[in-house]
Swiss-Prot record:
It comes from Saccharomyces cerevisiae (strain ATCC 204508 / S288c). InterPro entries: IgD1_Trs65, IgD2_Trs65, IgD3_Trs65, Trs65. Part of the multisubunit TRAPP (transport protein particle) II complex composed of BET3, BET5, TRS20, TRS23, TRS31, TRS33, TRS65, TRS120 and TRS130. Interacts directly with TRS120 and TRS130. This is Trafficking protein particle complex II-specific subunit 65. One of its GO terms (cellular component) is TRAPPII protein complex. Pathway: Glycan metabolism; beta-glucan biosynthesis. It is found in: Cytoplasm; Golgi apparatus, cis-Golgi network.
Amino acid sequence: MECFVPLRCDLDGSNIEQLRQSHLSRKFIIFDEQLNLWLWFQGNSQENKRFVLQNMIILINEAQVTRTSTIDDYFTQVENNENLWRLKNDCCSKILFKSNVVMNNGYNNQIKFVFEYKSVDANFNNQDSLQDPQAKYTLDKYSSEEILPSFEPVYSWSSAATKSSKNTNNHLEKNNRATHRVSSKNSEVHEADVSRNPNTFTLKLQYPIFSLLNMRLRNISLKSEHCILSSLDFQTSKASEQLTKKFIYPQEHNSFLKLNFQEISYKLIDGTSQIELDPICPLKVPLTAFSYDSISATFKLVLLPKSTQPHRVKITLAYELELHPNLKLPVRTSWETEVTLKRSMPISSTSSQYSSNNNNTNHSASFNGAANNVNSGGLANLRLGGVSSSRFSLGAASTTSLVNSKLSNVKFKFINSNIKVIKGEKFTMRLQIINSSSSPLDLVVYYNNTINPIPSANNVRNSNGINNCGMNNGTIPNSPLTLENQYQLHNKYRKIAEGIILLSNDYKIPVVPPRETYFADLRFIGIMSGYYGTLSGLKVLDLNTNELIEVGNGASVLIQ
């Protein structure tokens, strides 16, 4: 028996050699790819033998996705060739890739196909009798019950006990299995189980699997308009960059991934009925996206009362990965989700620690009071809306300790800290990581450029150097900011948070050994003109301790 996973999706199976050659050229699989998978049972006419499928298992990252012992569940027989079977069209979307076990941040994902087949007499046509009736189950019959694919359904205590004993015996017998490697191309392995039956064989195929897109759905309610704005955002992932460098353009450094989108669908569903919604701003499809591109489409929904169930939507993205003009891999991603709204955060002041520091050090209503406050350290630590003010970050240290309690000897420093670029131009900053500790570092760099809620009027007055003695005595109330002032502050600090984008987001740094130094080149692009005395939100995550550290305080960027 042979299994073909050809790169070309237009093959109809009329030429076995074309299937084989296209299969040999495949080096990877895309998550949600519409695979053109074939099984060819080539019999032995001299010995009057033929092969039948006994079991099929598909695993992603060692997690079992699906399993079946009946070939009719997933395959259809080709009319003109009774020995050739083709994977059903809906199996990839409904069964094979109905999971989230593939990570798109650069993790080494693997998919494995395991086929167990048996050689039988060609005159013996009762294929069903060869299979264990207790072991015949499929996910199609129970997909509506949302059974976890890595677990086997229990139908009765008697059948479960019988199956358990059989699995135990099979496990003991597999320890004595003799493996015969027929071919190692494309990670193919053929095995013969001579301990139980010399006519039982196993075929294994393993490929790296990549998820090309990062996707998210953001929802916000506008009570004044009685509606919900639902934003569908997606962009190319870190794994797509690895795929491009390793398999698509291994010899070229400046080549980009190319995705051709044919469908971007957002459907409102209710039971069996569904209706497709159009985005507020028209999105022309088909469209083409390249590496580092980001696409957003916003949809408008009716705001429902709190007592009712939230909206449920189905999102579908259909696109093709273009390897070259005559070879494209079809990918179809589809999922259902509820349109949930986050609880609105009230306008609150910053921590009492900052307020107490300001009240103790500020004793003048003039600008000198603010200067004294900066020198005493009160305003140097003040954050407005979660964003460090560049006015007081110019003198920030360029080196920062990762985890003072555990890894106090880890330092970060930007080598080229003073950058001057033109708006829209990409630039690179080199981050030096000095690991003087005795432990290796497993780090990820990411940029979280979000703006938190605006602080209260008390902290804004403190930041402007206004005397707080009257506030301590209760003569001046701590009134909240007006909507106009909040909007002005939002525009003021939006540039700090959103003016620079990290192109190499979720950058996985190779493990830094103890007492070693590593240089990481971080790629940015500036989309808003201005001076940035800090990159607030640029952080490093230690995967071993789950600790975060901000490393953007030592940066200084001027975008013209």
